[in-house]
Amino acid sequence: DFEETMEFVERSQIDAVAPAIGTAHGIYHGVPKINFELVEKLGKEKTPVVIHGGSGLSAETFTRLIELGGRKVNISTLVKNAYLDKTKELVLSGEKFAPIPFDTEVENAVKEEVKKHPEVFSGKRTSF
C-alpha cells in the first residue's frame, strides 16, 4: 500500500525502501505477480526503491522496474547458485583440482554471471 509505505518512510526517516511488490527471496516457483503500480508511485518519491528478491526475474521485468523507479536490485540467490552450480560441476567431473585452481574456476563462473546484470540494469541488454 502506497500510503502505508510512505508513512513508514517518513516516520522512520530511512535512506531507502524495499517495499513488498511481489518479489521474494530464493527461487521462484512460478511467475511472480509484481505490483508495478506501487513501484511507479514510490519511484516518484525522493526515497530510493530497492528491489529485493531479484534472482529469477526476467530482463524485461528488471527493465520495467528500473524505468518505474527501482534504484537498487538484489540478486543474491542468483550469485549463490552460480557458485554452487560450478562447484557441483567441478566436483562431479572427477577431475582432481588443487584448491586455488578450483576456487579460480568457481570465482570465474560467478563473475560471468554477475557481469550480465549491469548491462540489463542499464538498458544496454534485453536478455540474459
Language model features with spans:
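Alpha/beta enzyme core
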Residues: 1-45, 59, 63-68, 81, ...
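Hydrophobic faces of well-ordered beta-strands that scaffold small-molecule active sites
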Residues: 17-19, 49-53, 71-75
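Flexible, active-site-adjacent loop/turn segments at secondary-structure boundaries
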Residues: 19, 26, 55, 77, ...
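Generic, low-specificity signal for short hydrophobic/alpha-helical stretches with a mild N-terminal bias
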Residues: 21-24, 47, 69, 95-99, ...
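Glycine- and other small-residue-rich loops at beta-strand/loop junctions that grip anionic moieties
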Residues: 28-31, 51-54, 76, 106
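Short C-terminal domain-edge/linker segments immediately following a structured domain
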Residues: 47-50, 80-82, 104-107
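A hydrophobic, small-residue-rich beta->alpha segment in the mid-to-C-terminal subdomain
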Residues: 66-96
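Extended, intrinsically disordered, low-complexity segments
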Residues: 89-128
